[in-house]
């Protein structure tokens, strides 16, 4: 017999769903007369990698802000998996108080476009801060975590933990932002334009790192779910995620990378205008010496 929720639980916005990490139901959001999100319905399953793409003003960032609870919808619901409950529960974010939201937030992390690192502070301090303030870990555990996650993003903990953020290259700063997110051992990892502003070779390295991080399970053995907000066509080619394309706040496409790539839609086709150059670079037709960029 399948589990049944009580009417009280249903009224609190709780629903059963064993494999779903995010469910968005009939989501609307307007700013003035501008409809930014216009009836979004989306389900993200545990372990998926999803890229949300679209032009400027399509609603990508607003959708991300709703998923992490920074914005409230005009209509509709955003439900996220509650990994601290018994069973497979999805909880409506709008029903949560601060304590309930904090409980959910322990299991996700966001890598922001601007990295959100504290300038003037060291790499080690930036990684330790959420471990100390949010998770309340002791200093010995924090020290071990710092070394572990810095190695995971291909930095040298003996050299790089003591560097200040203003001493880092763009690629190193992005690696530190990813390391800080990994330190929280997230089941859901969200990236907002993770390669914006990076040189092409460095962007390639960050894309490969994102793919590698996605393949690693959490400490509890759960598959990691990755959600990317991006306009980076190269990333789609390298990672081949499930693709959600937004246009004027609506989902224009939801499907595999291969279907997206071969679409004849006049809206989708421009995303592949630069693909031949990328293919040449990946196949080695560019001078290899030109690709030896520092990380």
Predicted ranges, named:
Residues 204-221:
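Helical segment within the ABC ATPase nucleotide-binding domain
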Residues 189-192:
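Catalytic Walker B motif of ABC-type/P-loop ATPase nucleotide-binding domains
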Residues 68:
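Helix-to-loop junction immediately C-terminal to a conserved catalytic motif
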Residues 77-103:
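ABC ATPase NBD Q-loop/coupling interface
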Residues 164-168, 172:
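Conserved ABC ATPase signature
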Residues 140-159:
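Conserved ABC ATPase "signature" region
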Residues 185:
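Conserved catalytic motifs of ABC-family nucleotide-binding domains
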